Amino acid sequence: MNELIETSMKRHPYRLPLFALSCLFLHGCCTKAPPLDLPSEQNPEEQKAEEKWSVEFEENFSSLEVGSEPENLFILDGAYAVSQEKNDKRLTLPGSPVGDFGLLFGPRVREKSLSLSFSFLATKKGRRLPALAAGLGGVRSYRFRLNAATKQIILSRQDVEIGREVYQLESGDWCRVRFQALPGDGENTRIRLKLWKRGEEEPEKWLFDEVDPSAFAGGKCALWGYPYAGTPIHFDDLKIESKAL
């Protein structure tokens, strides 16, 4: 065998090295290369939306005395007090007198995205229906108002309407809300709102997802109750979150 190899090399001195290089080349092409740690191609807006939110304020009233007015809420008007049904404590606005009753809560959050979530329970009486509202950035900034009588939700900023959507209140059922103001590039602010029945999975789709050509100054969060039906309005699970820009 050795004689054959020696004879072959004498006759074709370059054939064996070329054969060896060909084997190495084929082996390199057929061997699976280790995966590269490449950066994600995730959409920048999706990546920003998934960034972690920080809790600024949270209250579920479970540790408060029934009949008390929570000290961490600034009541603008109305006889708001903690009430209880079975093992569930919540903040209640009485059904009488009828009027416009609001409150402020949480820290003044500025130069950040702001998210407010809460639960509410409102009940009609005959043909009379209640209304409620929530605000981001104080009483004069972004607000949505649910008018059960007209089956509409109106989104506004400083009393100027931004948009409206059809929405039918399910009387007697707890509802969850998520309301967000997301400052963008320049003076734009993205406003998002969704509502769903408490106990059900949060929907992915937003009822409102609008870009307002105004800068978001930030501030406190607010709630309002309008007991036009003469029945109590209940609020629970208040939570404010913020996210750095």
What would you call each of these model-derived segments?
Residues F61, D236-I240:
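Extracellular beta-strand elements of beta-rich domains used
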Residues E202-H234:
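Flexible glycan-contacting loops in extracellular carbohydrate-active proteins
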Residues K86-R157:
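Secretory/extracellular carbohydrate-interaction modules
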Residues F61, F118, D173-G184, I191-L195:
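Short tryptophan-centered beta-strand motifs in secreted/extracellular beta-sheet-rich domains
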Residues L38-L73:
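Extracellular carbohydrate-recognition regions
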Residues S156-R178:
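Short, aromatic/His-centered strand-loop micro-motif at the edge of beta-sheets
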Residues E65-R90:
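Extracellular glycan-recognition surfaces and repeat-rich motifs
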